[in-house]
Each structure stands twice: as C-alpha cells, then as structure tokens.
Amino acid sequence: MVRAQETVYDLITKCSVRRVPPKQFVNFYNEFFNERYDSVLENGNPAGESRPTAPVYEEVAQDLVRILNDSRVNLVADYVLEIVLINLNVDLLRLFLPKLHHVRNVMLLVHLFSRATAFISGLDNKLLAEQISDTVYTDVTPAVLSFNMQAIDDQLVIVLAKFLHAVLRLPEGQQKMGSVPTKQKAATLLQRLSTIDRLLYKRFIADLDGKLRLSGAPADMSFPLPPSNMPSPSVTSPKYETSSVGVMKRSTSMSNEAKYQDIKLARYYKNLWLNNKIHYCTVSDPLFLEKYDSILELATGGGLSADRPVKAKIADLVETAFTCFAQFVSNKLYHQSNSNFSLLERKWTVFVTKQLPLIIKSSIPDKTDIVLRTLENIDDKVIKAIKSYNTEKEEVKNRTEDLFDDYPVNSLDIRHEFLKNLIMMGLQPPTVLNEYLREDQMVDLKSLVTSEHLIIDNSQGVRETILNVRNFITKSIESLEFENLFDDGNQLLVTNDHGIIQIAHNLETISPTKQLEIANILYDLLSAAIESLDHKTISKVLTILTLNVGHLLTNIFCLTGYEKFARAVIRFIDVIWESNKSKSNDMVSDDSEFENINSAMAYTLSLCFIIHVVDIYGVNVEALVENPSKSTVLRFLSKLGEIPEVFVAPEGDLESSKTLLQQWLRELFVKNLISDNLMKSADVKVMGFMIPFIFKQTLLNVEYGIISDISSFVNGFEYFLQPFLSVGLINIVFWLEKYLLALKTTESFPKINGALFDILGAIIAPKSIGSDAKAIHSVVLKLKCVGLLKELKSFQVPSESNYGIYSSQTRQDPRLEALISKLELIAQSSALYDVDPRIISAVNNNYSQKHISYNKVVLTSDIPINKIMTNQINSFWNLHSSTYYNFDYLLELIDLVTPFKFVQDVFQTLKYKVTAYGVPGSATKPSSAALDQVLGYVFYFMVLRDIKCPEEKSLLLEYLDSGRFPSSISATVLTSDPTTISGMPPVSMPYDVKSEQDAMEGVDEDFDMLFGESFSGLPDDVQKSADMKPDTGIKEDDSEKSSYVSAARLTESFGVIFSKMKKDKLEAYQAGQISEERYQCFMGLYDKYVQTLRHSVI
C-alpha cells in the first residue's frame, strides 16, 4: 500500500533516480493514483454522483509544478508529458497548464514543450487529436500566452511558438481570441519572435491569422513585421538558396561573408550528421528525414523548416548525399593513403543505392521527377570526384601483371546504381537511365530489372520470380546443410546456388524493398527459433550472418539497425539458454546426442556472432543485456583472450572443477577417446573455459620442456573441433594471438617451433573435419584470422638476396606454410573490413612491394602520428570541412592520441594559427569571430562523437550543469590510458586480472574497457546492477527495464574533458596562476561546446 504522506512529487523523484522509462512510469503512476486517491474520491461523494476530481487534480498539478521547479533531470519532463498529454487527462491538463508560467526551470520547460511539440506533430490517433483540439482555444492557448513574454528566455520563446504552431493546426475553423490582455501577450510573443527567428515568425503569424480572429485588437496594438535587414538563412544547400530583399540591401563584404559562412556551416552540419547516422547504422530512424531537415537551426539559429514541401526536403537530401559521398571518397582517395578503412565506404554505398530510394518511396512515391532534376543539377566537381573514384576502383579490380593489357572501362558509377534501384521500385521508367547517361554510355534496357520481385536462378538454371518471399526464405533455411556450404578444404563456396546464399551474393540486383523484407524475415525466423529452441535454425541463420556472405549482414544492419538482432542473440544466451539449461543437462539418452550437438553449435555460433558485431560494427553489448550482474555474455566477453592459471568452472568450486578437469584430461590424452556419457553430459558453458585452459597449459608445458612427446596431445586436440567442444576455440584464438606475439621474443621458440606448428595445425589446419564442425571452425577462425596471420607470418624466415637483388620469397617450415595458407583462404573468403586489401585478395604478387599493414592506420617513421595530427589540424584551420566526413578515420585517430591530447593539440594550434594568420580565404583581418568560425566545425564533430542517443545528451548536459552524473549512473574516473579511451579496442586487449574473484567483481570495468563504445544511436533498455561495482551503480530491479547509458561512453566524452578542464582552469585562475583573459578565453570555448551540445540534432 502507498503511505498516506507520499505524493506524486515523491513518486517522480524516485522514478527519475532509477531512470525508469516514461512508458513504465505511467504504470507506476496509475497504480499510485488508484491507491492514493480512489478512496478520497469515493468518500467525497457517497451519493454516487459524479466524483469531485478538482481537488485531487489540483494537488497533482501543484506537485507537477513543484517537481519541474526543483529537478534538473529531463526525464522528469518526460514523465509530466506522459501523464498530462500523451495519456490525456483533460481535467488535469486544465488545472496544470495555467500553472506552468510559475515554473522557473527554463531547461525543463524547454524540454517539456519540445517533446510536446514532437508528440503533437506526429499524432496519428484521430480520437486523441479531437480531444486535444477541444482544449486548444479554451485552455492550451491562453495558458501558453500567460507566460511573461517580455522576460522569458529566447529559447523558451521559440519552443512556445513551435508548440502553439503545432497545436493550432489540430482544430478546424477560426476562434475569436479571448481578452485584450491575451491579444497583447500574443503581440508581445510575435514581437520577440520577429527578432529571434524570422522564419518561424512568418509561419506563426499565419497560424494566428488563420485560426484566431484578431480584428478586435486595440488600435495601438499592431503585429510587428520582421526587420527588413534580418538575413533569411538558406534552407538547403547553396544551390537551393533563396534571395532576400533584406540581404540584398546589405552592402558590406562582412555581411556577405557571414551569410556565406552560415550557408557553408549549414551544409557541413548536414553532411557530418549524415556521415554519423550512416556510420552508426541509424538511418532506419522513422524521423530521419525530419531530423535531417531540422539541422538548419543548429547552423544558423533559424526556425524550423517543417513547413517546407517534402519534395524540397528530398531534393536537398539527394543533393547533399551525393555531394557528401563525393567528398568522402575524394578525401579517402587522396588524403588517407596511410589507412585501411572500408566499412564506412560500404555503408555509404548501401545508403545511396538502397536506403535513399526507400526514403524517396516512403516520402514522395508519386512525385519522383524532382529526383532526376536534382541529379542533373549536381555540381560538376561532385560528378568528377565520383567518376575518378569509380575509375580508380575499376583499375584496381582489373589490374594485371601485363602493363600493356587492356581492360574494359565501366563508366557506370553510383549515380547510375541509384537510378537502377529507383527503376526496380517503379519510381522511374527504364528509359531514364539512358537519358541521364547521354554521352557516357548506353545501356541495353532489356537487361535492366524493372520489378521489385525477387528473381533467382533455380536448380535447372531457369530464372524464377519469387512471389512469396517469406515462404522461400523459410524453406531455404530449412533445406540448408552445412556440408553444402563448404568445400573439402572447408572454404565457403562462392558459387553455391542455394536460395539464401544466392540472394546474399546478388544483393546489388535485389530491390531495396525486398532487401528490407528479407532482413525482417531473417529476424523473424531467428527470433522464433530462439523462443522455440530450434537450435538448427539458429545455427544456420547465424552462420550466414557472421560469415557476412555477400556483405549480407552489413546490408541488413544498414537497413534495420543492429540492435534488434544483437538483442535477440544476447537474450538467447543470457535468458533462454539459462532457463532451459537444466533440461539440457538431463538429456543423456541416445536420442539426445544430435540435439546436444545442435544446441552446442547454436550456443557457440551465438557467441561468435556477438563478438563479431562488437568487433566489426562497434555494437555496445552492455546496453542490450537484460541483467548485467547475471549476464553470461558480459562475463565471457570480459574475459575474452584471458585464460586463468587455475581452472574454476562457472558456478562451480575448485574441487569439483579439478575433478572434472582430470576426467577430461584422462579421456582426451590417455584414452584418446571420449565416452558417450561424458560427451552427452558436457556443459558447453563450462567447455568454453575448460578447453582453452587445457590448451594453454599444454603449450606452456611444451615451451618449458616438460612435455616432449606431443603426439597424444595432437590427437586429443582434434576433439576440440567437435561441435560440443568447439566453443573453447573462441578463447583459444584470441589468447593465441597474444601468446605468439610474446613467444617471438623468447629463446625457447627455435627449440619448440616444430611442436608448436604441429599443435596449431591440429586446430587451425586439420587434415579432416566433420561436416557439422565446418561451420563453427570457419566462423571462429574468421574472428581472428588477420591477427593470427600477422603473428604467424612474423615467424617466416626471409631468403638470402640473389645477386644483390632483394626478393620477398621466403623459406619456411611446410607446417607453418600450411597454417598461413589456411588463414589466408579464410580471409579471402570472408567479407572483412578495415584491413589491407592484399590480405583479403587472392592475387599473389611475389614482386617487391611495401609491407602489408595489419592496422587501420599505418604509422611509420615517414608518417608518424605527429605528422598526421599536424596535417589534420591544418585541414581544420583551412576549413576543409570534407576532412571531417571520414568519420571512421577521425575516430581511430582520436583513439590513437587519446581524446584529452586531441582536445589540447587542436585548440592550442587553432588558436595560434587563427590569431597569427586568420582564416584562409577570408578577406577580413584576424578577429575573435574568426576562431568561432573555425571552431564551429570542430565542436559539432565533437558533439556527434560524444552522444549517440537523446538519453546520453540529457545526462551529459546534467553533468555539465552539476559536475556529476546522477547517482543511478555508474561512472568511472576519466583516464588517459589509451585502452580505456573511446572507440572500441581490439577484443584481444590484455587485462590486469589478479585473481578469479577480482575478475568476477570487475566484470563491468573490464567490459567497459573492451566494449564501452555505443554506436546504436537508439535508447538502451537495460539497468546495470549495483553489485557489479562496490562504489557506484544502478539499483537492481529484475522486473523493470530502464534506459541504460554506458558510463564509459560518457566519461570518455569531450564534454567530460571540458568539464574537468573548466574546474582546473577555475582553480588556476583563483590561485593567480593564469590571467583573467586566458580563463575567459577557455570559458568561451566551453560555452560554445555546451551551446552546440544543447541544440544538436541526434
């Protein structure tokens, strides 16, 4: 029962501390309200008449106003919005709104009205819209106009106007405005708005004229016109810029330059935001187009462009997309020869060719003529950059040993692929391709796919149209057999004509709508299989996805985001598997043998999938688990690459673990035969830790000379490839990379190299392997093939020079050669990203060439990190905004130098250069405004790196205001240690684990070091348990889910760095160590960052 003295104020306070999601808060509120006030309502009216609600809602309204004044947590405003407007309570709304002008907390008021505006704008519930519209003239408008329009903050003026702009569209017809004071307040609001936001002013006064009759206003009260000299910011790119009489009248070059910089900054913000959304696979956001179009506010301080025609928005997006892509590939081609990035390029290709057509179809399906006009108006420099990039790619693809060998040049580029997809979707006629190509190249129209239908080649070689895609995919997965996926050498068959494999290899010819449908079908199949424990289907789907056949997984993540797939697989291991573990352990009959194998495969492949999406796509797993303190996934990943000196089974004690270990050692290496009972009772979760322990101890004993005859061990290791034991291979390959790196520096290697290669051959390049084990073996090796290749190739011995001529030919142990060949084949058959192209190329060029790099950014004596940073900062100073567009490159660079040093170097150098030389290309002399101009680009990049979702934005702003995170958010101390700085370090990063107990207590900390980065761009529904860290943490509540934000992500942000620098600068200033001018200079930078963060579009 609720105690009598508890109030709504108390409820909101407690829920905000716990970070309870707004939707869940409503349930708590309803329960609280029923228990707290039902008796009051009933007792107040025993006659059974209508219940007296006014006193009750008056008390609730006062509590809401009080909490809005007292709290600094944006979540509180979300709660208020839920119970007043979203779950509409007209009685409460009529009592609450008139009290809002008493709230002095501007931050929460702005957040409240912003969220309310977004809700009203997207309202599609007709009944609710009618109910709200009934209150617009009688309650909402008078309440909003009751604010002191002369005294309130500019930002609050804007959000109030936007809110009224949205709600006045709900009712039909005109309504006479109430009293003269109300009209005067409306006039005051318009007066303020005309000096703050001209575009919004024009739309708002149109609303008042159309919805409210103003003819009865006093004669001396006239609605102000906007200042004629107020610039009207461009709503799109420079090509779509509209002229303004006021702008034309400005004759000074400084005004023209300021306008040009506004246009340039607006375009830059759009481009960088677009790169950010593509990089983090969040283009599938339903509000993508609206958010993109609202970025203008951030750059110019102008009003919303919500009233702009959808055609204009699409035209702007198409033009910006191709311009941004051209700048991206041009910068990559000419300025980043020292890097090996390819994943973002692939995502960009998917966005332009597949996602952009989907956005067009959902927005203007019948008005796509604007798209072709936009393409034709693209700047010639953009077209030239795209053509140059396409030519370079074709040359690399067709390059041969013969210098005189000619090859056909394909003049089709990404623009034409974009048009082909529009043609597939019926948004353009086939003839448009040749019309657009004109002099470039003619295309046989009969060869074009002009239908959205899925078309495949059946087993008879006949092209077949698939009408029921779901049924086709389902049957394709059911009939898929692992032995048909791989050849005798355990290599993935590229020429496989099986349904789902054929689809994966022909994604370019499949329409965007069908690709999205296929992605959703695969998710549905995976989810259904997880819920029903269909281990075979889970294994098949995850094998195809983890191997990324034909870049299928990348396309799926681009189209749908990665959160739902990752969350489903994590739930399988943490929840479904654990809840059915006892049943699995009881399966010891002969009939259960195959089911045990299937379940072990599903478990192992699920872990591999999770590791793969974290390592390649930067998925923040910690934000997706339901119960961090009990998560098997978190525990496994936090120890990835670490094998303890003493084996203790999960959920077991030392003695029982010792007995189990001895039993397996006897079966593996003495009897060389695993009994049926031991096989059937094997717990795959335990095997994941025991098998790596056995492997490590064997290698160490061989290295120390304790074991000399390895034949029995080699034979025993062959069992590690069996599906029920292969889970141990995961930790083995991650630990092995570090072990080989350390082994090179020891004196024991020459003595044991033969034995070492024999042992490695048993698990990496076995002579034979079962059909069921092929899939797991290939998937596990893919996770670390590049790292293992790097270390194994370092054992190669270069041959002596031949007559003074250098040769890269090597003489090596044939067993080592077999290991390297196997890993090279794995790399070549896998869709790997961000690696040297020669690693994944089947072409073997034995001529002298530069060394293969195994890092994303190549650092040499000729190109050290200092030189790279100098070039990057010079690009910032030159306002070469395209240098920001290679988001992946910049993130890696920041990780290399650490965020703190990046901030220091960038700001110190930029301040010096701008002060000494001004801004390149500017006609004006260096000024304080020049530094702001340069930093406008830098700050927006920093903000987009810092925050991935609205929750992180709110929490970071709270931290900057109060100097601390809420007690419910687990926060770690900011460090300059590069292993804990933003970006996802390799999953093989070594840890300092002192004991098994220490590791258990530090699961969360270790995991943040590995996977602290979050790229989801979406709210994370999970809570962190308080018992994972003794100092800080979230209170555990198994029954609830909450929006979870990784502490490591926030503490590694530039915002936290600025906050700590602010504190240090203030202490230094107060101690007289720095001048007031220097302190104020820093505070200007700090305020600029906070302002950019506060107004940023996520």
Swiss-Prot record:
<dbReference type="GO" id="GO:0051123">
    <property type="term" value="P:RNA polymerase II preinitiation complex assembly"/>
</dbReference>
<dbReference type="InterPro" id="IPR014801">
    <property type="entry name" value="Mediator_Med5_fun"/>
</dbReference>
<dbReference type="GO" id="GO:0060261">
    <property type="term" value="P:positive regulation of transcription initiation by RNA polymerase II"/>
</dbReference>
<keyword id="KW-0010">Activator</keyword>
<comment type="subunit">
    <text>Component of the Mediator complex.</text>
</comment>
<dbReference type="GO" id="GO:0006357">
    <property type="term" value="P:regulation of transcription by RNA polymerase II"/>
</dbReference>
<dbReference type="GO" id="GO:0016592">
    <property type="term" value="C:mediator complex"/>
</dbReference>
<keyword id="KW-0805">Transcription regulation</keyword>
<protein>
    <recommendedName>
        <fullName>Mediator of RNA polymerase II transcription subunit 5</fullName>
    </recommendedName>
</protein>
<dbReference type="GO" id="GO:0003712">
    <property type="term" value="F:transcription coregulator activity"/>
</dbReference>
<dbReference type="GO" id="GO:0032968">
    <property type="term" value="P:positive regulation of transcription elongation by RNA polymerase II"/>
</dbReference>
<feature type="region of interest" description="Disordered">
    <location>
        <begin position="1019"/>
        <end position="1041"/>
    </location>
</feature>
<keyword id="KW-0539">Nucleus</keyword>
<dbReference type="Pfam" id="PF08689">
    <property type="entry name" value="Med5"/>
</dbReference>
<comment type="similarity">
    <text>Belongs to the Mediator complex subunit 5 family.</text>
</comment>
<comment type="function">
    <text>Component of the Mediator complex, a coactivator involved in the regulated transcription of nearly all RNA polymerase II-dependent genes. Mediator functions as a bridge to convey information from gene-specific regulatory proteins to the basal RNA polymerase II transcription machinery. Mediator is recruited to promoters by direct interactions with regulatory proteins and serves as a scaffold for the assembly of a functional preinitiation complex with RNA polymerase II and the general transcription factors.</text>
</comment>
<keyword id="KW-0804">Transcription</keyword>
<feature type="compositionally biased region" description="Basic and acidic residues">
    <location>
        <begin position="1021"/>
        <end position="1041"/>
    </location>
</feature>
<dbReference type="GO" id="GO:0070847">
    <property type="term" value="C:core mediator complex"/>
</dbReference>
